[in-house]
Amino acid sequence: MEDLSKITSNVSKVVDEATKEIREAVNSLEPPKIHLLNRRSTLNICAAVAVDTGQTLFGGILREVGVALFQVASSQENDEPKSYAFWVNPNLPEKERQAVIHARLDNLLSEDALVREFVKAMGWSKIYQDRVMPPSCYSSAPALSNFLRELLEWAKLYEVGKKLEQIRSLGTGIQPVLLRDGTLRFGHAQAGVDKPLGDLFHSLKVPILGIPKKSELLRNPVIVLWLSRYGVYAQGGPLMITIDTEMFKELGWRLERYFGDEESRTRFGRYALVRFDPLPSSRNLFAVDIPNFLISDLDETLVLLSGVAQQSTATSYPVPGYPIALRKVHDKVVFTEDKVYLLENSLRRSVPPEIYDFLKGLGL
């Protein structure tokens, strides 16, 4: 076995080199531009999500046989979750498999108004047409499942956005805002879908913000040390940090990956770092994706984010400062332990005996 002191020495040397490079990168950056989120605003904030809730049913057996169960809902009071079951992994020869997937997607398009309206608004004739659904969806169950989940989520966001636009047109003086749990992109569709997607939501005249719970950007040591060096965490109250991407471009960072840019074909937003949590010394920041059509208007952006901060939770779920609308809609669609128990028992009673025996043989 290699001498422990030698291992320690090698690791220490590499860590020292990495730390030196990180500090040099931080020293080359200008101070962050901090904007306090203290604007007056009255917002009607709504969120919408789609989640695959079938992964835990029957100990994951449904997932193993290729069945996805999606729950789709918005945070609006009277909007109950809607379920979609889909066979994402038909064990068939390649040509038959493709035909089955096409037939099921055609059926979804013809029977579901939510999906049909979104597909029509995007200018698609088929869900699986070229330059929309990736070829990997025919060979990979996770790829098809992820594509469908995002399709349903964006369709729901569009439906809610249209309703909010109608309310805005009444002239109530209350600004509607849409929230998405994630970046502003259709990440599991073909490249190029996001530009028309951004144009569609821009046409609604209802701002949309992407707020992922976690971000690779905020875990980057350069960003963490940069914020610490200039006392950002010690600031009191909600705040936003605008990012001068040219500084990071000079460091060799790929802007599209970390921040988004106006030429991006894979998303239609750009990051700002935002803390909704009002407590000083809080490190609970979010990388908020702000649409390209909004981020150039700093005053409007600050008004919207100030309103979101006013309606953010101070609890620890999932992190302090998480917007209440997103928490509310997640609570709607996630199956509690009691609901899982009731649903599993209901399925046991309703499926034909031969199907139950089949699932039981798989470990049900």
Region locations from a protein language model:
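An N-terminal structural lobe/cap that precedes and organizes the functional/catalytic core
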Residues: 40-81
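Long, contiguous domain-sized segments
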Residues: 1-46, 53, 58, 85, ...
